[in-house]
Structures are given as C-alpha cells and as structure tokens.
Amino acid sequence: MTHAPISPVVLVILDGWGYRPQRSDNAIAMAKTPIMDSLWEVYPHTLIRTSAKDVGLPEGQMGNSEVGHLNIGAGRVVPQELVRISDAIEDGSIQQNQALLKLCAEIRPKKSKLHLIGLCSEGGVHSHLDHLLGLLDLAKVQGISDVCIHVITDGRDTNVTDGMPAIKRIQEHINKIKLGRMVTLSGRYYAMDRDRRWDRVEKAYNVMTSDQGIDGRSITEVLQAFYDQNITDEFIPPTRIAPGAIEAGDGVIFYNFRPDRARQLCYALTMPDFEDFDRDLISPLSFVTFTQYDPKLPVDVAFAPQNLNNILGQVIAQQGLKQFRCAETEKYPHVTYFFNGGLEKPFEGEVRELIPSPKVATYDQAPAMSAAAVTTSVCGAIEQGIYSLVVVNYANPDMVGHTGILDAAMKAVETVDLCLAKLLSSVNKLGGTVLITADHGNAETMVDESGNPWTAHTTNPVPLILIEGEGRKIPGHGGDVQLRDDGRLADIAPTILEILSIPVPVEMTGRSLIKPAEVEIKASRTPVRISL
C-alpha cells in the first residue's frame, strides 16, 4: 500500500546569522540575499534571543552553537556547564568534587605533576579562565606541589590577541598563590581541532608530552614574537616553554567544559587503541575531564551530564514519526549530539547524514563550504516524503565569520541564500512548513569598536521566519499566523510541536512562538514562489 507523501516541518538553522540594524561591517546586511529578503517581507517573522540567561548562560555571555542547538532541541532553557562550574568555584563546592579530590589523592603522595590543559580564554564558549584559576586554588588547598599549565590560546571566541592579557592574568595568580608554571603554548587551531586533522593535534601532543625543544624565552616573549610575525592566538604553533612534560604517574585535568574540540587531544592522551598517529601510551595517568567528552574515554568526569527528558527528537520518535538531520562536518555534532541533549545514539526513526567539510586551512578560502552538497542531501530527504521533521544546519555564516574577513563572509551568506531557494522548492512540492532561524549571531559583526577584525560570536538576536505550507496548515489560524516578539531558542521546539499538532510535554518550558488565533480569520497569505 502506497502512503501519501508527508508534508514535513523543516527547521533550517543558519549558523551565525545574527541581526544588527547597522549596515557597516555587517556581512549579512551587505550581502545580496534576495531569498531571505523576500521571505522576511512576506512571511511571519520575529527576532529571538540567543545569549545570556535566555540560553542558560551568565548575563552578557554570548551564545554558541553547542548551547544554541541544545536549547533548540530541549525546548527549555538548559543551565549551561559554564554556570554550573562557575557556581561551584564561587560557593567553594568544587573543593568537595569527588573526581578532583580522587585525582589529587592519587598524585599527592608521589609528588607527581598536575597538568592543567584547556583554552585560556574569557570567551566562555569552550572554557573560562576563571575555571583555570579556580583549579590552581584547588591544587594549593590540596597540597599539590607542582602544577604545569598547558596554555591554549583562543583568538576565535575572543579578540585575536587576547591571549597576552590572559597569560598575564594567569601569571599574576601564580605569583599570588606561589604555585603553578606555564610550560607549553599552543593555538587552538592545533590543540583543539575537531575535524580529524590529526597532524595538527599531533604537534600539540608532542609538545605537551616531551621536554625536547625548549624555547628558552618567557611565554610572553614567545607570544609577542609570534604576534610580530602576524601570527595571532588561534594559530600559535605548539611551543615548549619550560620543562614539565606529561609523564606516567602524573595527573591531568582537562578543564574545557565543551566536549567537541577537546575530544581528539583526549583520545591521543588516554585511549589504549589510539591509531590516528604514532605515539606511545603514557600510562598510568590520573585523568579528569570537567565534563563528559565521550563515554568511551577512560577518565573520571568532574561534572556529570544533566539528563534531559522529553526533548524534541525524543517526542517525535515517541509519536512513531521519522526525522532527518543533516549538516556538514563542522556542525554535524550540533544537529545530532547537542540537539539530542548530549545523546550520541539516534532516536528510533532518526536518520542522519554527514556531509564532509572542505579540507582547507581556514574557511575564507572556501566560503561556499559544502552548502550545496548539504542542500542536495536535504532536498532528497524531503522529496522522499517520509520525514515529519527535517533539521538542517548551514555552517557558512559562522565558520567564515570566524575568520574576520568581510568579503569572504559576504560570499558565505550569499551561498546560503541561494541554497534556500532550492530547499524551499523541494518543500513546496510537498506543501511543507519551514522555520528559518539561527543559533547565535556572528557574521553581522565583522569589525570591533577599535576597527579590528571581530572573529567571535555576538549577543545580537537572530531572525526567525515561519513559512506555512499548504499541506501543513497550522490549526485554527486560517493562514494568518502571527509570531510573538519576545521569543528565545527554547521556544522553537514547542512551536514545531504545535505545527505538528503534537502535545507539548510538561518538561518543555518554552512557549510556542505562534500567537493564539484571533477570532476573526483573515484571508490566507499568497505563498512566495521561488524561481530557480
């Protein structure tokens, strides 16, 4: 028996597509985007909040892809690990953390070294500098005599030379408590790769695990020398500053709280069956990660995962419906692992497709990235007519925005706009409904107040457009849907469930963005037809 094709709900996440009314240095406003412009003009639209307390982060903290997708998929504001860990340091409860105390108890009698690895940044996206300083204080209280800090500089979620003030702040704290020394220096480009570019990780690993090739200069002198060569924080080559290699019997705390860019270095340091580059396993190591990077890692976890029940993907599966997720490499974990509340395993009926990202050093060299292939995959899935929910992420505005190169970011934005035309054509064939939004801002701000390239995210709101399909009419509105203007990312999942006529579970504390229907039903809106 042949079933009629399903009219899907398609959630399109334009990663890093924020809203800023000023046109100057705004890659989104300056780019040619006829598709988004026409959709914004014709269809119901609003701006939603993606930062700070609206996504479970501290006041003033910019959002990011992990947090954004987690909040979207959960349908509620999820307290973030940044806040959990900061609170534990502030209230002193970190001094009772069992995983950290166990590590200290194992290395203290042997007077072994404690290694602190993480992104030395106040960006708050992968880590926070306050957490490193809190660990130094913990080590002091616990009587650890030798603490080696492996500095990873940012330059992506912060300004490109914010590594220098971060290092100076670390040194001030070291001088204050008389404990700790910075022994290696590496840009996140090497130490925090997440795309299996193992040659980069290998360079960072070798520097951290060997005392050979000590530079001889202070860490600030080394960093300034790289700046003088126009090599900024993200791209600092791994450099040994002082003795203090990771050796058998030592303790290691990896204090990044976001898993995706910490996993590969952790695999190299801990996995017995690691084969991605030649190395001898350093064993035994007492190893703690701040959060759970991967259940397979042979490490202790200081802050266990929060269990989220009745998230969007789970509710769709419970209804016996099929769903499709697609993104290229850079954002694939976000539409799968993070969207599913930190669960690696797909739900029943959830199909995933990973499109490889281009192998380039930085994405200004390929601003189109793999958007065309992502679009082809998603259109094929939509036209199968078997999926009730389709989730797709376009990485371009965010990944190219991170380069700080305006022209490239404009090309990235224009690429995505063209892809939307093809995607909407496929959705129109089945009468589906489309939600177009973003997880956070980025490409709308390419220059900071000092005139320097801005490579980080923003706290700006993002657009949300609802394109109601002929085959997926929202009950009770007669084609005249109105959207709230006070929404946030947590409200997207309840909105999708309302469109699908599925009850919203009590765990979802977000509210549908669709305003209650007015008594008077107005004429249906004439749909935009995209000419290809």
Curated annotation (Swiss-Prot):
It catalyses: (2R)-2-phosphoglycerate = (2R)-3-phosphoglycerate. One of its GO terms (cellular component) is cytosol. Keywords: Glycolysis, Isomerase, Manganese, Metal-binding. Catalyzes the interconversion of 2-phosphoglycerate and 3-phosphoglycerate. Pathway: Carbohydrate degradation; glycolysis; pyruvate from D-glyceraldehyde 3-phosphate: step 3/5. SUPFAM superfamilies: 2,3-Bisphosphoglycerate-independent phosphoglycerate mutase, substrate-binding domain, Alkaline phosphatase-like. InterPro entries: Alkaline_phosphatase_core_sf, BPG-indep_PGM_N, Metalloenzyme, PGAM_B_sf, Pgm_bpd_ind. It comes from the Bacteria. The keyword Transcription does not apply. It comes from Microcystis aeruginosa (strain NIES-843 / IAM M-2473). Monomer. Transmembrane segments: none annotated. This is 2,3-bisphosphoglycerate-independent phosphoglycerate mutase. Mn(2+) 1 binds at residues 398, 402, 457. Its cofactor is Mn(2+). Binds 2 manganese ions per subunit. GO terms for molecular function: manganese ion binding; phosphoglycerate mutase activity. The active site is at residue 65. Belongs to the BPG-independent phosphoglycerate mutase family. Its EC number is 5.4.2.12. Substrate binds at residues 126, 156-157, 188, 194, 258-261, 331. It is an enzyme of class 5 (isomerase). Mn(2+) 2 binds at residues 15, 65, 439-440.
